[in-house]
Amino acid sequence: MKSRNALLGLSLLLAMPLAAQEKNYVSEVWVADQGNGKYKNPILYADYSDPDACRVGDDFYMTSSSFNCLPGLQILHSKDLVNWSIIGAAVPYALPPIETPERPEHGNRVWAPAIRHHNGEFYIFWGDPDQGAFMVKAKDPQGPWTEPVLVKPGKGIIDTCPLWDEDGKVYLVHAYAGSRAGLKSVITICELNKEATKAITPSRIIFDGHEAHQTCEGPKFYKRNGYYYIFHPAGGVPTGWQVVLRSKNVYGPYEWRTVLAQGDSPVNGPHQGAWVDTPSGEDWFFHFQDVGAYGRLVHLQPMKWVNDWPVIGIDKDGDGCGEPVMTYKKPNVGKIYPICTPQESDEFDGYILSPQWQWHANINEKWAYYAGDKSYVRLYSYPVVADYKNLWDVANLLLQKTPSDNFTTTMKLTFMPNPKLKGERTGLVVMGRDYAGLILENTDKGLVLSQIECKKADKGEAEQVNSSVGLTQNTVYLKVRFSCDGKKIKASEGGNDLIVICNFSYSLDGKKFLPLGNPFQAREGQWIGAKVGMFCTRPAIVTNDGGWTDVDWFRITRK
């Protein structure tokens, strides 16, 4: 724990904008910038699912699907398309309806957003598969952002993207989730009012992908050289390809071309993302790659225009369809910028939640206290739901994305359970459809540290304890090592999911770590990768107060 003067810390916090506080964090475990004028893919070895990006002047901004996790719609900033940092979130506290669910809405809420800049304002549109198309806007991408506006109500409306045309009209392209709408594999367009706050026409299907491009979704809308372009993925998340539609008329007819596919590369399903250009006139394309437990990783591909068609990646045979690159020269943005990466480790020296963290549902202010002057975050034990089965039912999980293929997470915590209660728990967790962790519990026998795991947590299965040890102190260091040697799960869709093994250990002094329990194979969550973090809970009993855990620091390292 770092001691610091509280008044000095507070004054510095208020004096510095967020970007100044967070800039130039450099990961120990994954850096895309090779320092020699080249970069490697993925540029973000983290689950920024369904990425979209835009350029404003010399600055680039990215956002991605956040589903049920809050703060939602994290905003990333870059000066060169390779080095990124998190600067905020467009939905910082709650998604409509504004209420605090007792349990997470896994995989729901924010699907495939689009970020755009128009007339001095940033807009983000997204589809909520159960409610419809939403929009927020801001003059500054760091916020504040407006409250979400329901632009187009409707079940199954997803993957929305606006286009402001030269004649002043505003259009919205979107897809449908078959699970809610009863129809998928089509792309539709409707018109919005000039304020982009309300649909003023019904949606019209302008492309049917059932024959050639099953599961077409994730459309992004552009206009260039008199053509309307819709970039969309098809073929399914782990195995698909990237398609581009074009037409001289906004409602079509559209012709299509496949512009990016796996080919001979190791990058499965290279699709769904964003076209951006640089001030120097270069064109680039972001897309994701689904690798299972680590989620959907972000890649950057060179792009060029040939006869008014985009060609993405490297087109070896000249057929207009490229394949992904793994290394390439960095974009020409006129100068060289310092290396930086999204934030990971946290000393908890701030008075608000650091931008890499997300809760599993709309945020409840009773979950945590950010004691920046004391350099810790205090997690209060919050009661689980009455029909609790396992941590899949818990909203107050404080988690972050996994940042690399091989890394170690270590945290220091002090557990202060209510002596009148039994069953309060805290600890380190690797969360997904299956999960595992190191859990401290206040029992009749005192404090017990257990390595637990839960298979098929999403199906309501119970946890099992692999190993336990009694503790005589309430401060402990918890560690998990993530290891991946590139081997894949053959039974996964397309056989592309990576095998990720987690090994747990603990220490009483922060120096000597002892292994505890069994190796655990990490598994993805609902539309998201596995995440790592912490929690503090108590049983679903009536009581006027509970205990807490103070987390001193949380560090991600190479070893």
Predicted regions located by residue number:
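Carbohydrate-active catalytic/glycan-binding domains of CAZyme proteins
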Residues: 21-559
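Bacterial N-terminal signal peptides
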Residues: 9-17
